[in-house]
């Protein structure tokens, strides 16, 4: 009888950590970023660290765009569009 109890106690642990781990991670990760993103409405700069939707990609693009815009636009490569070239570009900027 003692053996059966020991075997049963060994089987439940491996079954618990598997299902308990996956749901806990995504559940806790989904709510915080979703709330921050919705509140920011696409302009979550400091929230990107928390894992905002596309804020991280946008933040990075903004940095590269600023640098490229200064280099490309200054040279006259994207001066044609002026303010329009900001959103109209093959690389995201000019």
Swiss-Prot record:
Residues 78-94 have a biased composition (Gly residues). Keywords: Antimicrobial, Keratinization. Skin-specific. Expression was readily detected in adult trunk skin, adult arm skin, fetal skin, penal skin, vulva, esophagus and tongue. Not expressed in the cervix, rectum, lung, colon, or placenta. InterPro entries: LCE. Residues 1-35, 65-94 are annotated as: Disordered. One of its GO terms (biological process) is defense response to Gram-negative bacterium. Interacts with CYSRT1; the interaction is direct. A structural component of the cornified envelope of the stratum corneum involved in innate cutaneous host defense. Possesses defensin-like antimicrobial activity against a broad spectrum of Gram-positive and Gram-negative bacteria, both aerobic and anaerobic species. Upon inflammation, may regulate skin barrier repair by shaping cutaneous microbiota composition and immune response to bacterial antigens. This is Late cornified envelope protein 3C. The lineage of its organism: Eukaryota, Metazoa, Chordata, Craniata, Vertebrata. The gene is LCE3C.
């Amino acid at each position: 009888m003692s053996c059966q109890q020991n075997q049963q106690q060994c089987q439940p642990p491996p079954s618990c950590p598997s299902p308990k781990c996956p749901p806990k991670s995504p559940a806790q990760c989904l709510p915080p970023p979703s709330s921050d993103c919705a509140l920011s409405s696409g302009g979550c700069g400091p929230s990107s660290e928390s894992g905002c939707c596309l804020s991280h990609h946008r933040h990075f693009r903004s940095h590269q765009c600023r640098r490229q815009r200064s280099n490309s636009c200054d040279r006259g490569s994207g001066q044609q569009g002026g303010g329009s070239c900001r959103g109209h570009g093959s690389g995201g900027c000019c």
